[in-house]
From Swiss-Prot:
Part of the 30S ribosomal subunit. Forms a tight heterodimer with protein bS6. NCBIfam families: S18. Residues 1-65 are annotated as: Disordered. Binds as a heterodimer with protein bS6 to the central domain of the 16S rRNA, where it helps stabilize the platform of the 30S subunit. This is Small ribosomal subunit protein bS18.
């Protein structure tokens, strides 16, 4: 039995079995407005053409990404990740105290995990900041 305040079957309420979401409206499809379609991808974007017909410069080759970064710990085997070395760990922190991601620091996955663990250890021992205080 449907409650009168919730809307019965096929009504535009928010709780009926065919209400199509919160917004009433008959039509099929889920979503929040009921929608007029069954959730299909409408063709209102127009013909965008093939990827290679979009223009741009015709030169092949690489984009100007610059030099590939190498992991400093893999390059120099004598260098170790040490949570007690504040200067080394600060290199991998932003000025806000966040850990710099791998794609920016250039670390390999193994050493990025070690750096992240070392930074977290340093934070627990109050060697490194969690955040930088606002003045």
């Amino acid at each position: 039995m449907a409650r009168p305040d919730m809307g019965g079957p096929k009504t535009g309420g928010f709780g009926g079995p065919r209400s199509g979401g919160f917004g009433g409206g008959g039509g099929g499809g889920g979503g929040f407005g009921g929608g007029g379609f069954g959730g299909g991808r409408g063709g209102d974007r127009g013909d965008r053409g093939d990827r290679d017909d979009r223009g741009g410069d015709e030169g092949g080759g690489r984009r100007g990404f610059g030099r590939r970064k190498v992991c400093r710990f893999c390059a120099d085997k004598a260098l170790k990740v040490d949570y007690k070395d504040q200067g080394q760990m600060k290199y991998f922190l932003t000025e806000r105290g966040k850990i710099i991601p791998r794609r920016i620091s250039g670390n390999c996955a193994k050493h990025q995990r070690e750096v992240a663990t070392a930074i977290k250890r340093g934070r627990m021992l109050a060697i490194l900041p969690y955040t930088v205080g606002q003045m």
